[in-house]
Amino acid sequence: MSDFAFKLYEYNVWANQQIFNRLKELPKEIYHQEIQSVFPSISHVLSHVYLSDLGWIEVFSGKTLSDALALAEQLKEQTEAKEIEEMEDLFLRLSERYILFLQQKEQLNKPLQIQNPSSGIMKTTVSELLPHVVNHGTYHRGNITAMLRQAGYASAPTDYGLYLFMTKTEKA
């Protein structure tokens, strides 16, 4: 796997943490507050992202997509009900699992055959799918930003350019 793909995943971890940091600054009830949006609440968005990320690492580790989807369905209500600090901890532990997995270079380009119940078999690799994991998180962080604005709050900046400036800018 290229350094870029790994750095992209590190960006994803950073961006998620920016969202958690911002949410913890706001009134506690905003996390579960119902908002007229794509998801009924911010807690539902973060649950969805977490369960999707969990599903992909399960698939990368050898589970079937059907098993990963079943696990997500089994954990859905439980994760939606968690408080922000509990979800932050779940995301942290999941990111540690990803990083340990991604450090196993031999796994990254091993062929995967993923059976999707509705669209057949996809032949791919972890390296090819990892940008999807990051892109999916980016998309839903945008949902959270829109939901926060709708509720009268600013979000946290999470764009990749800012991440690069924060991690690559030399101190004068």
Swiss-Prot record:
A divalent metal cation binds at residues 48, 136, 140. Homodimer. Belongs to the DinB family. Keywords: Metal-binding. It comes from the Bacteria. This is Protein DinB. InterPro entries: DinB, DinB/YfiT-like. GO terms for molecular function: metal ion binding. The gene is dinB. Pfam families: DinB.
